[in-house]
Amino acid sequence: MLAKIYSAAVYGVDAYEVEIEVNASGGHPVIVVVGLPDAAVKESRDRVTTAVSNSGYFWPRGRTTINLAPADIKKEGPSFDLPIALGMIAVSEEIDTSTFEKFSFVGELALDGAVRAVKGVLPVALEARRRGKHALFVPEANAQEAAMVDKIDIYGVQNLRQTFQFLRGEIPLLPARGDLSAFFATHQSYDVDFSDVKGQGHVKRAIEVAVAGGHNILMIGPPGSGKSMLSKRIATIIPPMSLEEAIETTKIHSIAGALDGEKSFVATRPFRSPHHTISDIGLLGGGAFPNPGEVSLAHNGVLFLDELPEFKRSALEVMRQPLEDGKVTISRAAGSLTFPSEFMLVAAMNPCPCGYFGDLKRECRCGPVQVQRYRQRISGPLLDRIDLHIEVPAVEYRDVASERAEEPSSAIRERAVRARELQQKRFAREAKTNCNARMTTRLLKQHCKLDQDSQDLVRVAMTELNLSARAYDRILKVSRTIADLDGAENIAPEHVSEAIQYRTFDRTLWV
């Protein structure tokens, strides 16, 4: 007898339908799984047969062939356990599975028949809805995540026996309920705020400029100056995510297994802060069956790299593609996967190995060669992709002790939103440009024209401050953003002057 059950598997950030065929025939008792299964899928034979027996059902005693179609795509993970078990029970008890055609099933089975949580349930639910399925059966722990998808019934099941009894009409089971729009509207608040940060007004201004134009930023300062504290609050002033951005971000976190019962949907900008010992694969993504890395988990949010020179050179170099293209392509013999990775890079570093170069209160123990060598750990091509460099001095006592209320994130975000709206209108006809940071050479010439005074200012700065040639385009882009924050149609000398201040690393005077 042949039984057909439908499931789904994740490939990249999307899911595709998998048809599971279970066929029982006479002969020596053996279970064969075909259709490019990985080790976890092959091991499901032992898990499933034990779970079926412990749930009080029988499994076919003859030769059982399990086919996972389409056969040209490798299947990975234990999420096929539940549908395979249902197919085996249906074959054993000679139940017609044609009534199951409008259902889809995912879930890992424990040996006692309990259904365990799996990764990637959100894209699976979206695919099931696209395929016109009436219902999706998922582990109870994943039910709220899947219930964010409307127009399809989501059933969170506890064990194999409960699932089969419901399908036979023996017990009732209520679908999980979720209102994505309502959840999204009520979960866009942050636990931190810029009003928590005392002083550092010029650094806050630089961060505001960076956010307003979508620029990457590097902060340089001694230990304890507040670089990490400032960085953790940057997401709070980025314009709020749209519902489409939130769904795309949640799909990536679902695939990576970064969601849980309390956080079934990502409604705020992600903030990722990997340790400097992270591997290339951990940062970029990859593996035998590629999973998203930190650059993709930071998609639509902030990637914070603290102690930037301490990261491996190879790890920093692999970031050049996602910074340039906004996506990560991972190639394997079986094909290529693409993960989105449009994030704002926020990096922080000490000015020297001891951390106190240029400090007026503590003596630096590093020589000029050590400082230069420390700085050179960051490659030129990576610095090319960071538009703003800002020095973060130690906080003065008068700022720490001040009772003056600091500006909240909401006020800063309002200004950033207005600047972004101007840029959206400016680049409405540009497919790959949505903010000033992504302007091409053609767009720079079109939208960043300087008057004579501004040109003279840039010329003097590049000559007197020994700014590198690569800094020129960055100055123009940042000047355009500062003008947008002022609501100015044209770039003025004061906009250029401020932009020049944000090129610390291009000044040979720095060392």
State where each predicted segment sits.
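Short beta-strand elements
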Residues: 18-24, 283, 387-390
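Short loop/turn elements that form and flank the Walker-type P-loop nucleotide-binding site
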Residues: 59-62, 99-100, 132, 150, ...
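Conserved inter-motif catalytic segment of the P-loop NTP-binding fold
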Residues: 245-279, 286-287, 434-442, 469, ...
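Conserved alpha-helical scaffold flanking the Walker A/P-loop in AAA+ ATPase domains
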Residues: 208, 264-265, 269-270, 280-303, ...
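Basic, amphipathic alpha-helical bundle interface domains used for macromolecular binding and assembly
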Residues: 40-45, 58-60, 67-77, 289-290, ...
